[in-house]
Amino acid sequence: MAGAAPTTAFGQAVIGPPGSGKTTYCLGMSEFLRALGRRVAVVNLDPANEGLPYECAVDVGELVGLGDVMDALRLGPNGGLLYCMEYLEANLDWLRAKLDPLRGHYFLFDCPGQVELCTHHGALRSIFSQMAQWDLRLTAVHLVDSHYCTDPAKFISVLCTSLATMLHVELPHINLLSKMDLIEHYGKLAFNLDYYTEVLDLSYLLDHLASDPFFRHYRQLNEKLVQLIEDYSLVSFIPLNIQDKESIQRVLQAVDKANGYCFGAQEQRSLEAMMSAAMGADFHFSSTLGIQEKYLAPSNQSVEQEAMQL
């Protein structure tokens, strides 16, 4: 490393399924961080990303191109992308040479959207593990489209994917419900927003699914999935609207607390600022009501909501 550069670096590994808003998140978060005075370096780790809206400090496309891999090896998009990540894993010296001059920056890693990379394939986890050896402290920021909350079956699937990702990636982890301004675009929520963000008693979700003739036949399967999720008791969500600065601030406070940035000495924070960052990461539950009033249309209570209050 360069002599006077700080040895420890911090950042976010932005992961999530395709279309969840990872690239938009990197753009919005980088602008917010620069407004706070942090030096930011956005790193594109997705070889399929084209026409990036942000200024890219490092682009994996300079090392390996998805189109070239697909043509040369006759692979499809998914297989080609997996090969690209394995190629990056085998050439981490290239990545380190790109990152070393950026010490002192706060990193945002825009990762590929293929779910298998975060649930069972080893390349991305190995890359993150090696970054930890370089004294780069990352928080995994997992984005999930908030409109999945309107479909109980999809929400259970999201919970399973989020849990599998948390266990596989092996990083401090934050789950986000992205695009909060569009949460009811495809339907109404069956319960209050805090039911989904805090992942409360999922038996109510099973009862709601039982009213559907199709899912009634899969009740035992859903019960086992719910039991697995509740046994681990790891998954929760923070609502995010990337256009809302207060929403971004809540996310950043949680991320900073997870990777230890708010307790670092690099910015010489005052004690008051440190306490604000440390404690602020825990108040998203109390702010959920305000978020619900802001983004969800008012409606009469459903039977499920009344049951939740008993």
UniProtKB/Swiss-Prot annotation:
It comes from the Eukaryota. GO terms for molecular function: GTP binding; GTPase activity. Keywords: Acetylation, GTP-binding, Hydrolase, Nucleotide-binding. Pfam families: ATP_bind_1. One of its GO terms (cellular component) is cytoplasm. CDD domains: GPN2. Gene3D superfamilies: P-loop containing nucleotide triphosphate hydrolases. The record marks 78 as: Stabilizes the phosphate intermediate. GTP binds at residues 19-24, 178-181. InterPro entries: Gpn, Gpn2, P-loop_NTPase. Heterodimers with GPN1 or GPN3. Binds to RNA polymerase II (RNAPII). Belongs to the GPN-loop GTPase family. Small GTPase required for proper localization of RNA polymerase II and III (RNAPII and RNAPIII). May act at an RNAP assembly step prior to nuclear import. This is GPN-loop GTPase 2. It comes from Macaca fascicularis (Crab-eating macaque).
